[in-house]
A protein has these predicted regions:
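Generic recognition of long tandem-repeat/solenoid scaffolds
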Residues: 31-32, 69-71, 99, 119-124
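Residue-level detector of beta-strand structural context in well-folded domains
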Residues: 20, 68, 110-111
């Protein structure tokens, strides 16, 4: 978390929380949802400003209830999740392929899930900021779930051995010479299984 953010929390400790104004879409884009977007159930405007995107990513936090928020100075801006708290991309690097979130953090995968709509979710550990209480934060590697970006589905299919299941696909996939499980899941089970709140409220 940015030092200036921590200082502002000490200086202004009782700023009201903000809900519904910021969203994370299925492609890992932050979206600003003004009053018109909220009233008309629109996705909102994609934030394209590079510095603002980086600022949000550095100060992206999860609380004990499973609500994700952006610590914007002294104010917590809770984030509506279109899918999952993290969106994964398969990216090349000098060490080979990497799984990276929208916040540029690495995912250490332990498996994957496939739902009835053909979505793939990467299960694994992500180094993330956790809010405890009274402006106390810590970082830890926590198991979570990340929707795989749809541009990487073809690449994933090349790594996977699939078998048809009742509602989706199961099987395994190869990641860095390891065979990891691919299990079926229903999309409406994702949030409860991984203990996050997609539409946070006060």
């Amino acid at each position: 978390m940015d030092e200036q953010v921590l200082r502002s929390l000490i200086k202004w400790p009782n700023v009201p929380d903000c809900f519904d104004w910021l969203a994370l879409d299925r492609r890992g884009q932050w979206r600003m949802r003004d009053a018109f977007a909220q009233q008309n159930k629109l996705p909102g405007q994609v934030i394209t400003h590079l510095a603002l995107n980086e600022f949000i990513s550095r100060n992206y936090v999860c609380d004990h209830l499973g609500r994700y928020f952006f610590q914007n100075g002294p104010q917590r801006v809770f984030i509506t999740l279109d899918a999952t708290p993290w969106i994964a991309r398969i990216t090349p690097s000098a060490e080979g392929l990497q799984l990276v979130t929208q916040c540029h953090s690495s995912i250490e995968p332990s498996g994957a899930l496939s739902d009835e709509r053909g979505n793939i979710y990467i299960v694994g550990k992500v180094h993330q900021l956790i809010y405890i209480q009274e402006n106390q934060f810590f970082k830890e590697d926590r198991e979570t779930v990340a929707l795989l970006h749809d541009h990487d589905l073809d690449h994933f299919s090349q790594l996977a051995k699939l078998r048809k299941e009742a509602c989706s696909y199961g099987g395994s996939w190869n990641w860095k010479s390891k065979q990891l499980p691919l299990d079926p899941i229903r999309s409406n089970e994702i949030a409860s299984r991984f203990k996050f709140i997609a539409i946070p409220s006060d």
